[in-house]
């Protein structure tokens, strides 16, 4: 699976929220419920645990945001924060990570309206995940960024892109396993009202997705996808010439043509997630069984069923081809810009590793 399109779509708004959090106090809210500055983001698919779908892979250029494809109700939001921060500015990566626990909680609350009883356990789970991730995965991320910095000066091949895909998939799987016990605990406590709220958020996000990416006007549809691709490309390589932009647009066809199939796969994942959540609510199985169900869902989104497999593979291949084309048309100056960008991300990652290096890491597996 390639870079999550929802991360890029919302990166500027997320970064705006990060800056607002850094400099402003939230509006007063009732004492029993924390302020939620992310409510205006309700319904968008950034926080959707099953809406993630990609059609463009800037694996070498943006390093896939390393873990931006991760799907679940806690860790996925954390990675969304990281991905959005990385897309906006180098220093924002640190800011996003440092405030990620708060934003992750707000996203979860936006989807399920966390109850008073659920709140302390949810916050503890998020803190536990961040402590683990800082120790276990940030060093791996720094290493992969270092590889990307070296590779970006060389001719890029599909194999290069696939290497970063595989590496980020492995990070995602490890993260899912780490968060799974806490996620199982949350699923066992969800009420019918919370599940209904989640379904409503999916529907709202899908409506926004259709409006932007499934516009009846082919030109509008292409423009929306092109803008997304160029946001990634400019972030990493800097500005592009008009000739380069025309060449990139000319290669957009396979990416745009698969839009309907991608949307169908997106909706199917959402429905599979909702079926799983309702099953857990109705049967209240032992925690170990809930974790087994979560693993099956993970396999579903990493290896979609046959009816979606062809479009899934086509999207991946289209993204790889476009990534390779963009990387190989860049000038020495653009490649130097990319190396500088990666180095700043590397520096920020190392700084984050040093922060709270001795933070305790606990597990919820036996809770």
Predicted features and spans:
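N-terminal amphipathic/hydrophobic targeting modules at extreme N-termini
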Residues: 12-15, 34-39, 43, 51-53, ...
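Bacterial N-terminal signal peptides that target proteins for export
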Residues: 60-79
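C-terminal motif of bacterial Sec signal peptides marking the signal peptidase cleavage site
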Residues: 88-89
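N-terminal Sec/ER secretory leader and immediately downstream segment
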Residues: 93-193, 197, 201, 342-345
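Short, low-complexity cationic-aromatic patches
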Residues: 97, 112-120, 172-181, 191, ...
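A cross-kingdom marker for long, charged
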Residues: 105-106, 266, 270-367
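Extended amphipathic alpha-helical interaction segments
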Residues: 181-305
């Amino acid at each position: 699976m390639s870079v999550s399109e929802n991360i890029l779509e919302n990166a500027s708004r997320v970064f705006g929220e990060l800056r607002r959090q850094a400099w402003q106090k939230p509006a007063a809210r009732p004492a029993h419920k924390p302020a939620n500055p992310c409510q205006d983001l309700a319904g968008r698919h950034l926080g959707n645990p099953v809406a993630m779908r990609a059609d463009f892979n800037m694996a070498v250029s943006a390093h896939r945001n390393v873990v931006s494809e991760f799907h679940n109700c806690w860790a996925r939001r954390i990675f969304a924060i990281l991905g959005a921060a990385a897309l906006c500015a180098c220093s924002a990566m640190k800011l996003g990570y440092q405030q990620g626990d708060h934003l992750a909680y707000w996203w979860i609350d936006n989807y399920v309206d966390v109850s008073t009883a659920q709140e302390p356990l949810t916050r503890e789970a998020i803190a536990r995940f961040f402590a683990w991730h800082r120790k276990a995965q940030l060093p791996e991320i720094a290493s992969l960024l270092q590889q990307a910095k070296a590779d970006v000066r060389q001719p890029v091949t599909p194999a290069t892109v696939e290497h970063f895909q595989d590496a980020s998939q492995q990070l995602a799987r490890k993260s899912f396993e780490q968060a799974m016990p806490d996620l199982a605990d949350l699923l066992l406590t969800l009420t019918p009202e919370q599940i209904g709220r989640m379904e409503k958020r999916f529907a709202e996000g899908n409506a926004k997705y259709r409006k932007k990416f499934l516009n009846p006007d082919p030109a509008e549809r292409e423009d929306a996808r092109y803008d997304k691709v160029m946001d990634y490309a400019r972030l990493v390589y800097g500005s592009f010439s008009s000739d380069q932009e025309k060449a990139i647009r000319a290669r957009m066809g396979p990416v745009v043509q698969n839009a309907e199939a991608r949307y169908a796969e997106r909706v199917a994942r959402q429905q599979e997630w909702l079926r799983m959540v309702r099953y857990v609510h109705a049967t209240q199985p032992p925690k170990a069984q809930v974790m087994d169900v979560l693993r099956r869902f993970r396999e579903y989104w990493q290896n979609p069923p046959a009816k979606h497999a062809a479009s899934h593979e086509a999207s991946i291949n289209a993204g790889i081809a476009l990534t390779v084309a963009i990387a190989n048309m860049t000038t020495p100056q653009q490649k130097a810009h990319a190396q500088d960008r990666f180095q700043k991300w590397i520096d920020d990652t190392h700084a984050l590793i040093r922060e709270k290096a001795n933070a305790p890491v606990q597990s919820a597996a036996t809770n």
